[in-house]
Amino acid sequence: TEEAVQLLSSYDMFASSGRDYHFYITDASGDGRVVEYDCEKETRPLVAMPMEAITNFYGLYRDKVLPNQRNGIYGHGRERYDAVMKVLEEQAEGYTNDTVWDALKASSQEPNPVDITSNTQWSIAYNNTGLTAEIVIRRHWDEIISYSLSQNDVTR
């Protein structure tokens, strides 16, 4: 994770749509961080902070993001973040692959014709020690595509 943070710190990325980028980065040791460019500072410094989850808002300013509404430059999706955190708290004794899928399902969104960002297009559960990923497209939870990095193999 630290290596990825250092790599990103050498870039200044700005989304032309008026929103900025943020990334959730983890490694096999369990180090997970949200990495984002500070939207309140003119110099937009890169900030990396330990967090267990993130949705469509700046983690740096999560205290300024209220659920079920737009929150200006800070983003939206607090209710989905809260749903993920509830799953993680309920299963705090030990996360499993089922924990990941429970959290992804809890935070998924059905399409909403008046809100372009309200459609979960894909969900991915990464296994950083097994070097695998399970992918679900458009909330078809029973149709899992599996990928193995070590085997460079895709299965359905």
PLM region descriptions:
Residues 1-13:
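Compact, glycine/acidic-enriched structural inserts
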Residues 18-21, 26-156:
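C-terminal, well-structured catalytic/ligand-binding subdomain of enzymes
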